[in-house]
């Protein structure tokens, strides 16, 4: 199994320096990871560092709390795309989903999907499963499929826990179309990654991508 092609090599710490960003770009090129995932302020640097490689540029949006308005999220996504993002990982407004405001959540996910797809940019929707009950997962799966987003993603890594096997099983239970799954948060070993891929995940978000692919 070519684990490297599943890895979004991730650095989202607020303390990340330019030197740190260049380092993960070099690592991603060496190991041919799927993407480098960073905060929006670092997208242009990542684009420059990855130029000519097979590694995609990925930016998070409204990270880590998803608490920006829909309008701000759309604008942030557009700016990240202008700066060179080829993939967007957007955090939903979890509070709106939990209180049952499905119209708000649908409008938000649909608006970001439209902004991304107009520029042929892939969208991953982060739902922060640590806060969700099964009903919430069923609702957000239906919303994401209706919007036409490309991926559902478990976690930011900043919640009370990261991905779990049960999360992925519930996604598989409620996703009826071709929406892909990204496991993120707490995926640190080769065994972890192989477990999630075996359950049907198409991407793994991790800051420990090298340890995952080398087993060291």
Swiss-Prot record:
List, in alphabetical order, the Gene Ontology terms for molecular function in this entry.
Answer: deoxyribose-phosphate aldolase activity
One Pfam match, given by its short name, reads DeoC
Keyword flag Protein transport: no
Catalyzed reactions per annotation: 2-deoxy-D-ribose 5-phosphate = D-glyceraldehyde 3-phosphate + acetaldehyde
Which residues act catalytically here?
Answer: 89 (proton donor/acceptor), 153 (schiff-base intermediate with acetaldehyde), 182 (proton donor/acceptor)
GO CC terms in record: cytoplasm
Q: What is its EC number?
A: 4.1.2.4
The cross-references to SUPFAM superfamilies, in alphabetical order and at most eight, read:
Aldolase
Q: What does this protein do?
A: Catalyzes a reversible aldol reaction between acetaldehyde and D-glyceraldehyde 3-phosphate to generate 2-deoxy-D-ribose 5-phosphate.
NCBIfam families, A to Z: deoC
Q: Which family does it belong to?
A: Belongs to the DeoC/FbaB aldolase family. DeoC type 1 subfamily.
Protein's UniProt name: Deoxyribose-phosphate aldolase
Name its species: Treponema denticola (strain ATCC 35405 / DSM 14222 / CIP 103919 / JCM 8153 / KCTC 15104)
The encoding gene is: deoC
């Amino acid at each position: 199994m070519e684990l490297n092609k599943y890895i979004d090599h991730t650095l989202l710490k607020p303390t990340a320096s330019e030197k740190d960003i260049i380092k993960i770009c070099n690592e991603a090129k060496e190991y041919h990871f799927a993407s480098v995932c960073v905060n929006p302020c670092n997208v242009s640097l990542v684009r420059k560092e990855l130029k000519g490689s097979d590694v995609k540029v990925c930016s998070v949006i409204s990270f880590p709390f998803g608490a920006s308005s829909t309008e701000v999220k759309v604008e942030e996504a557009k700016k990240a795309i202008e700066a060179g993002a080829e993939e967007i990982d957007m955090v939903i407004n979890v509070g709106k989903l939990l209180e049952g405001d499905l119209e708000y959540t649908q409008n938000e996910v649909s608006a970001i999907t439209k902004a991304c797809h107009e520029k042929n940019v892939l969208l991953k929707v982060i739902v922060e499963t640590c806060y969700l009950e099964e009903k919430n997962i069923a609702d957000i799966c239906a919303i994401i499929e209706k919007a036409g987003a490309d991926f559902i993603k478990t976690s930011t890594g900043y919640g009370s826990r990261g991905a779990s096997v049960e999360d992925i099983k519930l996604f598989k239970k409620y996703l009826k179309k071709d929406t892909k799954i990204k496991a993120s948060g707490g995926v640190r070993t080769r065994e972890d990654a192989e477990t999630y891929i075996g359950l049907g995940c198409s991407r793994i978000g991790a800051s420990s991508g090298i340890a995952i692919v080398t087993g060291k």
